[in-house]
UniProtKB/Swiss-Prot annotation:
The active site is at residue 304. Its cofactor is Zn(2+). Substrate binds at residues 61-63, 93, 277, 308, 322-323. It catalyses: (S)-dihydroorotate + H2O = N-carbamoyl-L-aspartate + H(+). This is Dihydroorotase. It holds the Pfam family Amidohydro_1. GO terms for molecular function: allantoinase activity; dihydroorotase activity; zinc ion binding. GO terms for cellular component: cytoplasm. Zn(2+) 1 binds at residues 59, 61, 151, 304. Catalyzes the reversible cyclization of carbamoyl aspartate to dihydroorotate. Keywords: Hydrolase, Metal-binding, Pyrimidine biosynthesis, Zinc. GO terms for biological process: 'de novo' UMP biosynthetic process; purine nucleobase catabolic process. It comes from Bacillus pumilus (strain SAFR-032).
């Protein structure tokens, strides 16, 4: 199929808005400029729309296999398409875990059969993610593993992490870490701060995360491994990563939209839709995360999309599972909060959600250039609408942002040159 995307505006390398047309043939961008329709082309009128590279989210929980009541590869990828994402990376905390070549091959086939967008599957670092025995990295890489992580739990022993890093480095693969020292969790369900004290809840201290990162960056230096920090959340963690980068250690980090937008003082009552891991931290932590993103300490934004059933989230704050959904709301939330207010440029936000994650993991995506894969998202920056969790394509409706009015909604998504979402409907 050939498309000519007409009359939209793109961003130059300096952030200037310019009107350009884009010709897509098959999976590839063939031309960008002032173009006329050719025979057989379908014209997409993008007048008044921002034409962005397809968004990239390298931290998503699709729950399949084993958690299909919460989400599936099909429903999660539909949610991604609606949110403007063309590439997502699926975490391995499923049942069974993708810890063998056979399980990874099954997962790759399932992705091919049911996904609307590109899904990059993580493999687990340890068998069943219990931290005792390392998986066969080489076999998993051959079967399609994108990188290695035990996300959802931290690798508790330095020896296991060091061996994993050495093996990953030998295969030119990344170790992606959920940073949490179990001995410092203390049964917590929210951040250790004023909110936890006021509500009589066990709190998770900031040191639980930062001490793990401090250990791991030194191991990564010794192993010469690409080490990536998931969902960084504390000011101390930002300081550790900043110092590690200054020392030349190959470390990258991501931050989730909710940690940029909220702190624990924003939690209304005991609403479990504000419960995630890591938890919403203090105001100073949120400010440090924003500063770290802007100065390059933190590399990109990832949603940590974590769907749960309504029944699960109706439990108490102590008992309800951690996690919120984010694929369908991330761009408009961040655009409204940071770009419309003038704190960030549009280019900064788009880079954090496209080229920056691609560069961090050497992926050939995230650019609008001739010859590139045609991953393209059309966004109506002026479209203002209230978030409605009942309209989500994800099975999960666990969001703290329901009914919030925001601007900057994706209206069409092309993945590898195919229209996979058009406002109001999924295209398969």
């Amino acid at each position: 199929m050939s498309y000519l995307i007409k009359n939209g505006f793109i961003l130059t390398s300096t952030g200037e808005k310019v009107q350009q047309d884009i010709r897509v043939e098959g999976e590839v961008i063939q031309a960008i400029g002032h173009l006329e329709r050719e025979d057989g082309e379908e014209v997409i009128d993008a007048k008044g729309l921002f034409v962005s590279p397809g968004l990239i989210d390298l931290h998503v929980h699709l729950r399949e296999p084993g958690g299909e009541k919460k989400e599936t590869i099909e429903t999660g990828s539909k949610a991604a398409a609606r949110g403007g994402y063309t590439t997502i990376a699926a975490m391995p905390n499923t049942r069974p875990v993708p810890d063998t070549k056979e399980q990874m091959e099954w997962l790759m086939n399932r992705i091919e059969e049911t996904s609307s967008v590109r899904v990059l599957p993580y493999a687990s670092i340890t068998t069943r993610q219990i931290g005792e025995e390392m998986t066969d990295f080489a076999a998993l890489k051959e079967a399609g593993a994108f990188a290695f992580t035990d996300d959802g739990v931290g690798i508790q022993t330095a020896g296991m992490m060091y061996e994993a890093m050495k093996k990953a480095a030998s295969l030119d693969q990344a170790i992606v870490a959920h940073c949490e020292d179990n001995s410092l969790i203390y049964g917590g369900c929210v951040h250790e701060g004023e909110f936890s004290k006021a509500n009589g809840l066990n709190g998770i201290p900031s040191i639980c995360e930062s001490v793990h990162i401090a250990r791991d960056v030194l191991l990564a230096e010794a192993a010469n491994c690409h080490y990536h920090v998931c969902h960084i959340s504390t000011k101390e963690s930002v300081r550790v990563v900043r110092d590690a980068k200054k020392a030349g250690i190959r470390v990258t980090a991501e931050v989730s939209p909710h940690h940029l937008l909220l702190c624990d003082a924003d939690i209304p009552g005991l609403d479990t839709n504000y419960k995630m891991n890591p938890p919403l931290r203090g105001k100073e932590d949120r400010e440090a995360l924003i500063e770290g993103l802007l100065d390059g300490t933190i590399d990109f934004i990832a949603t940590d999309h974590a769907p749960h059933t309504e029944e699960e989230k109706n439990e108490t704050m102590q008992r309800a599972p951690f996690g919120i959904v984010g694929l369908e709301t991330a761009f408009p939330l961040l655009y409204t909060r940071f770009v419309k207010t003038g704190e960030w440029t549009l280019k900064e936000l788009v880079d954090y959600m496209t080229i920056k994650p691609a560069e961090a993991f050497s992926l050939p995506y995230g650019k609008l250039e001739k010859g590139q894969i045609a991953d393209i998202t059309l966004i109506d920056l002026n479209k203002e609408m209230a978030i409605d969790k009942k309209s989500f394509l994800s099975k999960g409706q666990n969001t703290p942002f329901d009914k919030l009015t925001v601007s900057g909604w994706p209206v069409m998504t092309l993945a590898s040159g195919k229209v996979v979402y058009e406002e109001g409907r999924l295209v398969k």
